[in-house]
Amino acid sequence: MVTNSPSRSDISVYNGDRQGPMYSLIVPIYNEEDNIPVLYERLKAVMDQLASTELVLINDGSGDRSLEMIRALHDQDKRVCYLSFARNFGHQVAVTAGLNFARGQAVIILDADLQDPPELVPQLVERWQAGYSVVYAQRVKRRQESWFKRLTAYGFYRLLQRLADVRIPADTGDFCLMDRQVVDLLNTMPERNRYIRGLRAWVGFPQTGVKFERDPRHAGEVKYTFRKSLRLAINSLVSFSIVPLRLATYLGLLAALLAIAMMILVLYWRLSETNSPLDGFATVVIANLFFGAVQLICIGILGEYIGRIYDEVKGRPLYTLAEMAGFEQLL
């Protein structure tokens, strides 16, 4: 049962007998030691403008000094809470952990590379205060990104919009603000293969966007390589559409029709006693390769869905925590 959220004019939210902050800022971190100092200073300036706020940092198994720097920030500023994974579980799982532990009435997700400008947060808050349950940041320009990255991103979002069962806004990432009501619903979803921007669209409620120009990465290396981006794209399609399964059916029907057409042509040429252009070893090899490729594509599509079912039935936890601090402040 979903209950109405408390008044957004309140300066705090109560969870049982605990008084929590009004806002939670969630930032997943993986090998971001070069960005953390600047990230904190810019987030601190934003937090000082808002009502009671907590900053939830999730160390996703970093191999550099990120965890050490996060601990220092917690000692310096008690608004900083953190979780540290026992190993790297991935960006989407790190965001999920942040949502699990965030206590704010409004929860804001942003990345640590500063491509998502913290200074945009007050605009997200304004739209939330106007009555929207989800306010997502929508990119209108990608600074210093390659033409290949821009082209593939543009094509992917348009393809996803056409194939997905729900409308997922184009040119959006995880940078958004979500109402407590939405976060509580997301926390009830046990899916292992997470696609946060799709899940937040699926839950419904009033949603709107705030347009912005995405900045280049402040420092360090890009964490979303082509391989990881491709994996995320496949996961989003499989999680929110059954069209790939239908495509496998259509490919099978097309292959069957081509086989029937070839059979009719061969019979016609044989009966008419003309030289058949389909005679010969090469024709047989080409036909076998074509139909074999169709079968492998269909098996691959089925495998993606079956693999996700296998992940779900194993029932393992999404992540394991090695360390956490700051959340006891409000217990």
Swiss-Prot record:
Q: Which InterPro entries match?
A: Glyco_trans_2-like, Glycosyltransferase_2, Nucleotide-diphossugar_trans
According to the lineage, what is the superkingdom? Bacteria
Q: From the record, give the transmembrane residue ranges.
A: 247-267, 281-301
Q: Localized where? A: Cell membrane
Identify which top EC class this enzyme belongs to: transferase
What is the topology of this protein in the membrane according to its UniProt annotation?
A: Multi-pass membrane protein
Q: Which Gene3D superfamilies match?
A: Spore Coat Polysaccharide Biosynthesis Protein SpsA, Chain A
Q: Which Pfam families match?
A: Glycos_transf_2 (PF00535)
Q: Which UniProt keywords apply?
A: Cell membrane, Glycosyltransferase, Membrane, Transferase, Transmembrane, Transmembrane helix
The GO terms this record gives for MF are:
glycosyltransferase activity
Q: Which GO terms describe its cellular component?
A: plasma membrane
Q: What Enzyme Commission number(s) does the record list for this chain? A: 2.4.-.-
Query: Keyword Phosphoprotein on this protein?
Result: no
Q: What is its main location?
A: membrane
Which protein family is named in the record? Belongs to the glycosyltransferase 2 family. GtrB subfamily.
Q: What is this protein called?
A: Uncharacterized glycosyltransferase slr1943
Q: Which organism is it from?
A: Synechocystis sp. (strain ATCC 27184 / PCC 6803 / Kazusa)
Q: What is the lineage of its organism?
A: Bacteria, Bacillati, Cyanobacteriota, Cyanophyceae, Synechococcales
